[in-house]
Design a protein with these regions (language model features):
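Core transmembrane alpha-helical segments of multi-pass membrane transporters/permeases
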Residues: 30, 55-89, 107, 115, ...
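Long, contiguous bundles of hydrophobic transmembrane helices that form the permeation core
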Residues: 1-14, 38-42, 47, 184, ...
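Membrane-core helix-loop-helix motifs of multi-pass transport proteins
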Residues: 136-223, 239, 379, 403-445
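Re-entrant/interfacial helical elements at transmembrane boundaries that shape
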Residues: 90-92, 124-137, 165-177, 325-327, ...
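Membrane-interfacial loop-to-helix junctions in multi-pass transporters
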Residues: 4-8, 63-69, 95-109, 140-148, ...
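Transmembrane helical segments that form the transport core of multi-pass membrane transport proteins
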Residues: 250-355
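Hydrophobic alpha-helical transmembrane segments of multi-pass integral membrane proteins
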Residues: 71-74, 100-133, 332-376, 380, ...
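Transmembrane alpha-helix interface/packing and boundary motifs in multi-pass membrane proteins
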Residues: 17-25, 79, 113-122, 153-159, ...
Length: 445
């Protein structure tokens, strides 16, 4: 099977999964594993890969996401225990006193927490810091969960440009440049991005304010019909432990600090946090078992999606098919447009984020585009900057990014709704950043 045919099969696989997700044909886990299995069967049947090779690709793919899956299970359990114990009730009460019914203030607070939380460059830890803290406030004010995610992913996309962030380091390594040097060059675009992140919070905060004012009491019924609040509805007051509030706050802060310091694997931090939280707040094996079971369904549902996404990534990414997809895409760029390569790839970066995982995008597509750009005298750094800045805007709405599923799982939003709600806005933000880069002289053509 030729490289072009392999690439076309890869595109067909990705498009099939996206269509199944957006049309709500089935749950994400089944979409990932069924389509990936069909593709794997075709690859083995045509002799492109042996059965052993394909098994190895799938194993590597699942291995690459299993940490995120375990992290999700125990993070859901940890924050569930803290919610049962009543810790968030007091925190929410304090926040509500500060902001009252100031919807715009809540949106800005979300942006601030996401920006600070993403200083470590970790998408999972930022979602774990921001969403559990802000989601109860959004529910109390009847703000949409999709808006919470939109504000989060906008701020996170901008902060993901730090030199210790994965995308910047990957791009710098490909063009053989120091990450700090690349970051200094793109910093003006990041500053514009931060302004846009704050603007996003203000704009969508005002939109939520108008929506709530317009619908009035009817909004309660609308939210009840749209969201399943069975996981956080009427809590069992018998599980509340107000006397342990200080301990629970200290434990939560300790978990977050250790996460940011990156001393231990994130999932292990939450395992220990769960153990301490359950043992200190509750007594008896029966109660421990009951609490774990009450939160198991949410954790296992999303963990299964993440693991099945690992199968998808294994079949396409570990096999090298995504790299072949990148080569085919680059071959369609007309020679007459070669010098405009940074602009072209900048405009297309958000849609491409839905097709390529981070490694394939930077290690597969970037080297090919740099080679093409060299033929037209295009500075490799300008191509890298356009790809890093514009692509980051869509990192956390991509169905091939494991952290995306952690975020939507914590917020209780379907992947199709998340993409539909955020895609247009994130694409707009990326184009504004690109235009700013051109105006400020960060990118030349």
């Amino acid at each position: 099977m030729s490289d072009t045919i392999l690439a076309l099969l890869g595109f067909a696989t990705v498009i099939a999964v996206i269509v199944l997700l957006l049309r709500n044909v089935t749950v994400p886990a089944l979409a990932f594993v069924s389509v990936s299995t069909i593709t794997a069967a075709i690859l083995v049947a045509t002799g492109a890969f042996t059965l052993d090779e394909m098994a190895g690709f799938i194993k590597e793919g699942v291995k690459g996401v299993h940490g995120t899956a375990v992290l999700f299970i125990f993070s859901v359990l940890f924050f569930g225990v803290m919610t049962d114990a009543g810790m968030f009730d007091k925190i929410i009460g304090a926040l509500m006193k500060k902001v009252g019914n100031n919807v715009v203030g809540v949106a800005l607070m979300t942006c601030l927490i996401a920006v600070i939380g993403h200083l470590d460059g970790g998408g999972a830890s930022t979602f774990l810091i921001t969403i559990p803290a802000m989601l109860p406030v959004y529910k109390r004010l009847h703000m949409r969960r999709e808006t919470l995610l939109l504000i989060c992913v906008t701020a996170m996309g901008v902060m993901n440009l730090m030199p210790w962030g994965g995308p910047t380091m990957r791009a710098a390594s490909v063009i053989e440049m120091e990450p700090n040097d690349l970051w200094f060059q793109l910093m003006p675009m990041q500053i514009v991005g931060l302004v846009l992140a704050v603007g996003t919070a203000i704009f969508w905060g005002l939109q939520e304010k108008k929506r709530i004012a317009k619908l009035g009491d009817a909004i309660v019924a609308e939210d009840a019909g749209k969201y399943d609040d069975s996981d956080d509805g009427k809590k069992d007051e018998a599980l509340a432990r107000p006397q342990n509030f200080i301990f629970n706050v200290i434990l939560t802060l300790a978990v977050i600090i250790v996460l940011v310091l990156d001393i231990f694997p994130s999932y292990y931090v939450f395992m220990v946090g769960c153990a301490l939280g359950i043992l200190v707040n509750y007594r008896g094996k029966k109660l421990h078992s009951s609490i774990i079971k009450s939160h198991a369904s949410a954790g296992l549902s999303m963990a299964s999606t993440i693991l099945c996404a690992g199968v998808f990534l294994g079949v396409l990414s570990k096999s090298g098919i995504m790299e072949k997809m990148a080569v085919v895409m680059a071959s369609f760029i007309p020679t007459s447009l070669g010098r405009f390569l940074p602009i072209i790839i900048g405009i297309l970066s958000v849609p491409l984020a839905l097709l390529f995982d981070t490694d394939s995008y930077f290690y597969g597509l970037l080297p090919v585009l740099v080679s093409v750009g060299n033929q037209f005298g295009v500075n490799p750094a300008h191509i890298a900057i356009a790809m890093v800045v514009c692509r980051n805007c869509a990192t956390f709405i991509s169905p091939v990014a494991p952290a995306t599923y952690l975020g939507i799982g914590l917020a209780g939003v379907e992947i199709k709704d998340h993409i539909k709600y955020c895609f247009g806005w994130q694409w707009g933000v990326s184009i504004v950043c690109l235009v700013a880069g051109l105006i400020l002289g960060v990118i030349h053509f």
